[in-house]
């Protein structure tokens, strides 16, 4: 067996794990997993993420708005429409305000999953504004960010260079030599 594993990016709160979530999570310590950072991608899954974080002492949470959450409801796939569109009408700033109380929870250790994803047909200006707001929030809260960078490396890099937040880049679609 290798050394201990800390999974820096998980979505066990996703519906894909409904059938076996508890059994799977219960088994992780026996497989060498010493920690998991469970990601909320919008206000709709934040309560489920925190429920897991409070159930398991080795699970912590990251709370944020994923750029894909800005997709129109018809494009959201099996998870259904994100509250960013279905509840807040695309007003991510209002959703960020609704998320603020979660950051007081000691199990919330990061802002994320946040970033840019130019694969999906989400307006670039909205993504940039949201990501910049989440970076500034992370700096204000003195928390790291969990960055999603899909086909948007130049813009992600520019914002990270401008603000220099602590964090992890989890989805990275750039060429190796540019990393």
Where are the predicted features?
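Nucleotide and nucleotide-moiety/phosphate-recognizing core
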Residues: 137-139, 156-161
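Conserved small/polar residues in nucleotide/adenosyl-binding loops
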Residues: 177-178
């Amino acid at each position: 067996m290798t050394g201990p594993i800390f999974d820096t990016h998980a979505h066990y709160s996703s519906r894909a794990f409904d059938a076996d979530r508890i059994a799977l999570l219960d088994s992780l310590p026996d497989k060498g997993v010493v920690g998991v950072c469970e990601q909320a991608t919008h206000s709709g899954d934040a309560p489920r993420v925190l429920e897991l974080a409070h159930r398991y002492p080795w699970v912590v949470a990251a709370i944020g708005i994923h750029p894909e959450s800005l997709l129109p409801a018809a494009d959201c796939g099996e998870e259904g429409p994100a509250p960013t569109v279905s509840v807040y009408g695309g007003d991510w700033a209002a959703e960020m305000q609704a998320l603020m109380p979660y950051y007081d929870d000691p199990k919330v250790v990061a802002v994320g999953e946040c970033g840019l994803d130019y694969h999906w047909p989400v307006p670039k200006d909205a993504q940039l504004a949201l990501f910049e707001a989440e970076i500034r929030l992370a700096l204000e809260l003195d928390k790291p960010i969990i960055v999603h960078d899909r086909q948007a490396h130049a813009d992600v890099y520019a914002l990270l260079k401008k603000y220099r937040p602590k964090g992890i880049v989890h989805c990275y679609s750039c060429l190796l030599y540019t990393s």
